[in-house]
Amino acid sequence: MSLEQHYSSILTQLGEDVNREGLLDTPKRAAKAMKYLCRGYQQSLEEVVNGALFSSDNSEMVLVKDIELYSLCEHHLLPFIGKAHVAYIPNGKVLGLSKVARIVDMYARRLQIQENMSRQIAEAVQQVTGALGVAVVIQAQHMCMMMRGVEKQNSSMVTSVMLGEFRDNAATRSEFLSLIR
């Protein structure tokens, strides 16, 4: 059974008439949208980075902040929307600027929980760059908590992962946290 057929079945199970005008192409559109929203499964870290790793003598923090992200909660298939802040301390190599955002997107475009996604992003940046430290903070609003369940409209979730120098050195961690405020 195709994804489109599954969506048609879901609509029918909800009591909808899949032959009414407004729903005629909905299963097809929904299947296409879900494939797009989950395209991270079709990507690899090597493909996303695409060789954009450059030699550098820089040993100071590199920070890309306010990277917008859109993901789907793996528990309810509802969106969570937020921003990621990703920093690393280079160890002879720097990553092409857009590649940090592409790494975030690769992991966000999967069925996820924010806690795991934060760690996956940090470990990916560490793996690719060999950085002395990596820090990731993500703040997001979860529709599964806003639209259903407790229905808390102003809540957000913050997760952080600190590796290497960011975990071991309070001054480095504090500098990062002050820069993302």
UniProtKB/Swiss-Prot annotation:
**Cross-referenced Gene3D superfamilies, in alphabetical order?**
1.10.286.10, 3.30.1130.10
Per its UniProt record, what Pfam families does this chain match? Answer: GTP_cyclohydroI
Q: Which UniProt keywords apply?
A: GTP-binding, Hydrolase, Nucleotide-binding, One-carbon metabolism
Identify the enzyme class: hydrolase
Q: Which GO terms describe its molecular function?
A: GTP binding; GTP cyclohydrolase I activity; zinc ion binding
| Substrates-to-products reaction catalysed | GTP + H2O = 7,8-dihydroneopterin 3'-triphosphate + formate + H(+)
Q: Give, as in the UniProt entry, the pathway in which the protein acts.
A: Cofactor biosynthesis; 7,8-dihydroneopterin triphosphate biosynthesis; 7,8-dihydroneopterin triphosphate from GTP: step 1/1
Q: Name one GO cellular component term.
A: cytoplasm
Task: Give the record's GO biological process terms.
Answer: one-carbon metabolic process; tetrahydrobiopterin biosynthetic process; tetrahydrofolate biosynthetic process
Q: What Enzyme Commission number does this protein have?
A: 3.5.4.16
Can the keyword Endoplasmic reticulum be found in this entry's annotation?
Answer: no
Family named by the database record = Belongs to the GTP cyclohydrolase I family.
> What's the subunit arrangement here?
Homomer.
Q: What is this protein called?
A: GTP cyclohydrolase 1 2
Species of the source: Pseudomonas aeruginosa (strain ATCC 15692 / DSM 22644 / CIP 104116 / JCM 14847 / LMG 12228 / 1C / PRS 101 / PAO1)
